[in-house]
Amino acid sequence: MAATRTETDTFGPIDVPADRYWGAQTQRSLQNFRIGGERMPLPLVHALGVVKRAAAETNIALGKLDPVLGQVIAVAASEVIEGKLDDHFPLVVWQTGSGTQSNMNANEVISNRAIELLGGEMGSKKPIHPNDHVNMSQSSNDSFPTAIHIATAVETVNRLYPALEHLTKALKVKEEAFKDIIKIGRTHTQDATPVTLGQEFSGYRAALEYARHRLEQSLADVFLLAQGGTAVGTGLNAPVGFDKGFAEAVSEITGLSFKTAPNKFEALASHGAVLNFHGSLNALAADLFKIANDIRFLGSGPRSGLGELSLPENEPGSSIMPGKVNPTQAEAMTMVATQVFGNQTAVTVAASQGHFELNVFKPVIAYNVLQSIRLLSDTMVSFADHCVEGIEPNTARIKELLERSLMLVTALAPAIGYDNAARIAKTAHKNGTTLREEALASGLVSEEDYDRLVRAERMIAPQ
């Protein structure tokens, strides 16, 4: 039987594993919430470490916390930030809606680790108490939403933005490489007027640049922190100036520019800032879905599809059809986008549940937002590295489809009129003849004028 030690809380004593830093409230949560396997996301755990370190430093600065105790709390909290204590955060997302159990998990782990650093006895709560010292000037009600904002901002800046830039650059390379390849455009999935393959890829690249702009705009409110509102937004038990000092400390720790929220009542009860930001993630997912679909459809074949693009062959595609290779990176990215669309609904419903002074769907908001950031980041890097970088144009197929298209007739419309041009296209389609043959047979245009007007290279920009 594994060794245990006895920890206590207001409900009395309880045994916890001797080699774990968590205490009584974490252990009770493990026993009371045996629901699923979705652990609290590690970026959120690390953000709680930031909260506890920043609170300790601010309490020291304001003369509330003994500097000796505060400094060792900061050391233990830094270990949480660095991921050294990840194994000591076992709780699932499905717990109290305020995130109190996870906040106490952080308080207990940091308390016991700090006691250990001072040579004391774990579980004694002496000389560092999880509530009185680690949680000083705080409530779960302001600490947990603050951690959500910190984790969201840090993950976005350090993970999502680099991944988005990586894919954008990969598309830009192809845009330049394909700039002189003229192909048939398509609207409503039907033939339209010509574009260059580079122009098509420029649309993908620009979509991601606009997505980055929307993300940056919506992230601005995420940099506003609830800390200092304590239980209901009034700031009870937090000293004057704690909120501003705390935000400055978080900025110093993370290297990002955080500020205290001007209205703590809104910050505790509403999660509009995070919902709005996830809306930008949702929009990015929609763009990625479109890009992935376009590329896999343009690469369909190899003998019976559009076949304008050759996609990298990364792995066998079928357990029954020998030699089959599938557009797996595009499929993975569209599944990620689908998950993000679902997360958007979950975050929307959760953010609407701010009853009176507190929203009590905080953990599920954190889980879905951070999952979306992680999945989008990973899939963009994977799609860039294993798909986009290896895309090659099938120029012969592109030329064949361009020359067969009846929509080149659009170039004749200014000269012979829309109705006449439409009749020529319909006749060619009905008879299985070429556009050129029917145009000349109509007597409406000479061979010389047809060859002058119907030139794909003159149809890809204003003339």
Swiss-Prot record:
User: Could you tell me the EC number(s) of this protein?
Assistant: 4.2.1.2
Q: Could you say which residues bind substrate here? A: 98-100, 129-132, 139-141, 187, 319, 324-326
| Cleavable signal peptide | none
Q: Does the keyword Lyase apply?
A: yes
Q: What is its main location?
A: cytoplasm
Q: How does it assemble?
A: Homotetramer.
The scientific name of the source species is Brucella suis biovar 1 (strain 1330)
Per its UniProt record, what HAMAP family does this chain match? FumaraseC
Protein name per its UniProtKB record: Fumarate hydratase class II
The protein's GO terms of the molecular function aspect are: fumarate hydratase activity
Additional detail: There are 2 substrate-binding sites: the catalytic A site, and the non-catalytic B site that may play a role in the transfer of substrate or product between the active site and the solvent. Alternatively, the B site may bind allosteric effectors.
What role does it play?
Involved in the TCA cycle. Catalyzes the stereospecific interconversion of fumarate to L-malate.
